[in-house]
Regions:
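A detector for small-residue-rich transmembrane helices and their helix-helix packing motifs
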Residues: 1-209
Length: 209
C-alpha cells in the first residue's frame, strides 16, 4: 500500500476508532450529537465523529471504499495543483465533506437529545462522487457481482439516499451520504470547471453494448 494522504487518513481513522472502542467515554464524547453541540458548543464533534466508527465492519467498509476512490481524487488534485497544494486541498476536501454533510442533520436533530451518529459517510461519499465526475465510465462493482458504470450507480445512489432520508427509521444517516455526494461533485466542478465538459463528453461516448 503506497504511502499517501489517503493512507494516512485511513491510519488515523483506524487509530481513533480503536481508541473509541476501548474507551466508551471517548466514543460518547466524539459522536455526532447535535443536541450536545447546540447545548455545550462542542463544535469539534463535527470533525471527530467522522474519524470513529461503530464497529470493525463499519470501519472496514468505509475505509475500503475510501481507499480506492480517494486515490483518484488525491491524484487528480496533486496533478492539477502540485504535490503540496494538491494534498492540502485534498485534506480540505475530505474534512470539509465530513463537516458540511452533517450540517443538515445538525439542524434537523439539534433539539433531539436521543440522536447520535458517527462514521466517515460524508467524506467517503464525497470521494466516491468526486471520482465519478472524473471517471464516470469506470465500472463500480457491488460485492463483486453487479458492475455498473460509475455515473449510473451514482444516480441510483442519490435516488436511494433521497428516498430513505425522507422515510427514515433505519438508523442510517442518509442525509450525510446525500450531502457528502453533492459536496464531492460541487468541489470538483469548482476547482476544475473543465471536468464538467469532460464528464459530458464521456457520458456521450457511453455505449451499453
Amino acid at each position: 500500500m503506497e504511502l499517501s494522504a489517503t493512507v494516512l487518513i485511513i491510519a488515523l481513522t483506524v487509530l481513533t476508532s480503536y481508541l473509541a472502542w476501548q474507551k466508551p467515554n471517548l466514543m460518547e464524547r466524539w459522536m455526532f450529537t447535535p443536541y450536545q453541540i447546540q447545548k455545550k458548543n462542542q463544535w469539534d464533534r463535527f470533525i471527530l465523529s467522522g474519524f470513529i466508527h461503530k464497529d470493525g465492519t463499519h470501519l472496514l467498509f468505509n475505509m475500503f471504499t475510501f481507499y480506492f476512490f480517494g486515490r483518484v481524487v488525491e491524484s487528480f488534485l496533486m496533478i492539477k495543483f502540485g504535490q503540496t497544494v494538491g494534498i492540502g486541498m485534498y485534506l480540505l476536501f475530505y474534512v470539509g465533506a465530513i463537516v458540511i454533510a452533517d450540517i443538515p442533520t445538525y439542524f434537523k436533530h439539534q433539539s433531539h437529545s436521543y440522536y447520535r451518529a458517527l462514521g466517515a459517510s460524508g467524506g467517503v461519499a464525497a470521494t466516491v462522487f468526486g471520482s465519478i465526475i472524473l471517471m464516470p465510465l469506470s465500472d463500480i462493482c457491488l460485492f463483486g457481482l453487479l458492475c455498473l458504470p460509475g455515473f449510473a450507480l451514482g444516480v441510483l445512489f442519490l435516488i436511494y439516499s433521497l428516498v430513505q432520508s425522507k422515510k427514515g427509521g433505519d438508523g442510517i444517516n442518509h442525509d450525510a451520504h446525500l450531502y457528502g455526494a453533492l459536496f464531492g461533485i460541487a468541489f470538483i466542478l469548482i476547482v476544475s470547471p473543465q471536468s464538467a465538459l469532460n464528464f459530458v463528453d464521456q457520458i456521450k461516448s457511453f455505449r451499453l453494448f
